[in-house]
């Protein structure tokens, strides 16, 4: 049995990993980080799974940025210095940063190294774990035609809602093949609804826009370095110092939305284009966000909320019905596009657990999102 779980390209990763990597190189080049795999769904991994994963991770070490990829990336992101793309051209995954062990059905994956390097591992390793799981357990997905038909059917419903949608499904996709097919179908569907994907390689392949800004780990690091009280404020200030108003969607739930709004002052509220909702009740969040903008004298319709918390059609419809005409909205849809193949979906994460700011000591990081289920750390 030939196992196919591999990455197509060094850009087969989520856009925000690269945008964060650039910011880390600029601001925190000596910081270190540790990450750990968390098996939320209590999936049982078959014998030999860990070994296969190790092999797949070794293979990642061979990937490098091609000239075509470099040109595409640089043209797409004029706000990133050319030196970054030169750096990326020389970047290679170092499998020594990753430790994989398996005891019975339990899988352990740990990553450790300089943050600016280890930041790229999370998404590829998660997608490899998903794909390998389906391959090694031998379960059959639906046919390619059906995968495309499922996506097409969803898009016809989404079109009627008159909204924009991006694919955010790299990390927990069924496989690269399915992901590729999904983006191809979304692109060929040819309506105004589909606006891009978080996957940089597939954005290049299908001439669409790579989408994303930053993730929880950006704020988790700031909390470890500067204390929780200041994490959101300094995280956003630093982001704005690097990107000067570009990539202006702020992630708001790393330490609960309430704490976020307290620090989201008038300068930041004006500067950022909007925010991303990733946990907790979406409607409640939308109302709080609208209230926040109004309290700062800003028209909520000039701002956007990107919803990305485990969405499907019913959730999206509910959000649209509430937000229409009150505030700008867009949606990032993950597994519901890239892993709707009539099999059990993987519920796994790979999260930063500790960080070593250059002048400190190893500090555990935590995330207190708006849902207890999504908390990590102690």
Predicted regions and their residues:
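Glycine-rich phosphate/ribose-binding loops and adjacent secondary-structure elements
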Residues: 2-6, 211-378
